[in-house]
């Protein structure tokens, strides 16, 4: 899980979602693409 000031999709499979007021990127294809805005 990377924590960065601005999150963006790295590949086509990445999905930008909102959980508990936080913007996150989840990726079923490549778990290394997981990010959270912080």
UniProtKB/Swiss-Prot annotation:
GO terms for molecular function: structural constituent of ribosome. It comes from the Bacteria. NCBIfam families: rpmJ_bact. One of its GO terms (cellular component) is ribonucleoprotein complex. The gene is rpmJ. Pfam families: Ribosomal_L36. GO terms for biological process: translation. Keywords: Ribonucleoprotein, Ribosomal protein. Belongs to the bacterial ribosomal protein bL36 family. HAMAP family: Ribosomal_bL36. SUPFAM superfamilies: Ribosomal protein L36. This is Large ribosomal subunit protein bL36. It comes from Synechococcus sp. (strain JA-3-3Ab).
């Amino acid at each position: 899980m990377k924590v960065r000031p601005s999150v963006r999709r790295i590949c086509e499979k990445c999905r930008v979602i909102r959980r508990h007021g936080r913007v996150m990127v989840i990726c079923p294809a490549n778990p290394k693409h997981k990010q959270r805005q912080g």
